[in-house]
Amino acid sequence: MRLILSLPVLAVVLAMVLEGPAPAQAAPDVSSTLESISEKLTEFGRTVADKFRTAVDQIKKSDFPEKTRNWFSEMFNKLKEKF
């Protein structure tokens, strides 16, 4: 029973493989490839810039820079007192 079911499936797969790529799946020409790479790089740059801008805004809104500055000031003053 398994052999009877697997033979038609094998025939369909073999027919699809031998048929070759569809016209939409054919290899694109060089100019369209270069254009798509340019578009992808531009989009990547925008995405990175947006994420960086968001991260900087979050850091500015947090109190982390102030706490860090205060901690360094305290440590510097402690070192000055020791010397």
Curated annotation (Swiss-Prot):
Coiled coil: none annotated. It comes from Rousettus leschenaultii (Leschenault's rousette). InterPro entries: ApoC-1_sf (IPR043081), ApoC-I (IPR006781). Its main location: secreted. Inhibitor of lipoprotein binding to the low density lipoprotein (LDL) receptor, LDL receptor-related protein, and very low density lipoprotein (VLDL) receptor. Associates with high density lipoproteins (HDL) and the triacylglycerol-rich lipoproteins in the plasma and makes up about 10% of the protein of the VLDL and 2% of that of HDL. Appears to interfere directly with fatty acid uptake and is also the major plasma inhibitor of cholesteryl ester transfer protein (CETP). Binds free fatty acids and reduces their intracellular esterification. It comes from the Eukaryota. It is found in: Secreted. GO terms for cellular component: high-density lipoprotein particle; very-low-density lipoprotein particle. Residues 1-26 form the signal peptide. GO terms for molecular function: fatty acid binding; phospholipase inhibitor activity. One of its GO terms (biological process) is negative regulation of cholesterol transport. Belongs to the apolipoprotein C1 family. The keyword Ribonucleoprotein does not apply. This is Apolipoprotein C-I. Keywords: Lipid transport, Secreted, Signal, Transport, VLDL. The keyword Signal applies.
